[in-house]
């Protein structure tokens, strides 16, 4: 509760650390009166007590670049919507970890993972020909799906939403992780027409590119 002993102690500790850090930085930088250093005291971390999530994340973390916080968001959403009609899309799946996480809880509909497996689209300006994820491989994802025995889970190689093999009618969750504005915009306008009432679209890397 707001104002309890723990909360007040964290606020005191935050203010103390801000003072110490500002003091030492002042020897190296010119700090203005209005300049502030922000230290978060947020302690809400529900994934710590979710033993089922922790168990699976310890395994799935080898197949994703998502941190525990973002992975838990996908886990929780897929749990909440597991009985809703519609498919789950993971656009920009890389090694498949984010899709695997959502697939583990799903009961109705398919989980479909999409990736070009070629890096960024050549039309993406500064990003063209920069295949920084050189270990992308669709066969690796297919084998992992089979190894994990994930039901109704598939992977397609494409620059989403072009040339999709499976017909998508309704979407209950879409995780967009395509790194660039142009690709994200194109995918979003396609997905929003098919998202169900109460469905969710998650933008990863928001504000980075």
Give a label for each model feature:
Residues 1-62:
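Membrane-proximal basic amphipathic "stem/tether" segments
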Residues 66:
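Residue-level marker of regulatory loop/turn positions in helix-turn-helix DNA-binding domains and
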Residues 69-73:
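N-terminal pre-P-loop "Q-motif" helix
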């Amino acid at each position: 509760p707001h104002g309890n002993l723990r909360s007040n102690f964290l606020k005191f500790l935050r203010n103390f650390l801000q003072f110490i850090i500002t003091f030492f930085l002042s020897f190296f930088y010119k700090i203005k009166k209005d300049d502030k250093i922000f230290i978060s005291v947020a302690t809400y971390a529900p994934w710590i007590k979710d033993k089922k999530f922790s168990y699976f994340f310890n395994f799935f973390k080898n197949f994703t670049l998502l941190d525990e916080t973002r992975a838990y968001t996908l886990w929780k959403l897929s749990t909440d919507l597991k009985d809703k009609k519609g498919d789950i899309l993971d656009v920009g799946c890389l090694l498949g970890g984010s899709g695997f996480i959502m697939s583990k809880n799903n009961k109705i509909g398919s989980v479909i993972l999409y990736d070009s497996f070629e890096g960024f689209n050549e039309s993406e300006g500064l990003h063209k020909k920069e295949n920084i994820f050189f270990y992308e491989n669709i066969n690796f994802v297919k084998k992992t799906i089979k190894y994990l025995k994930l039901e109704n889970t598939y992977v397609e190689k494409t620059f989403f939403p072009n040339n999709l093999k499976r017909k998508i009618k309704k979407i209950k969750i879409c995780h967009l992780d395509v790194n660039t504005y142009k690709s994200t915009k194109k995918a979003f306008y396609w997905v929003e027409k098919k998202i169900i009432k109460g469905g969710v679209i998650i933008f990863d890397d928001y504000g980075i590119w």
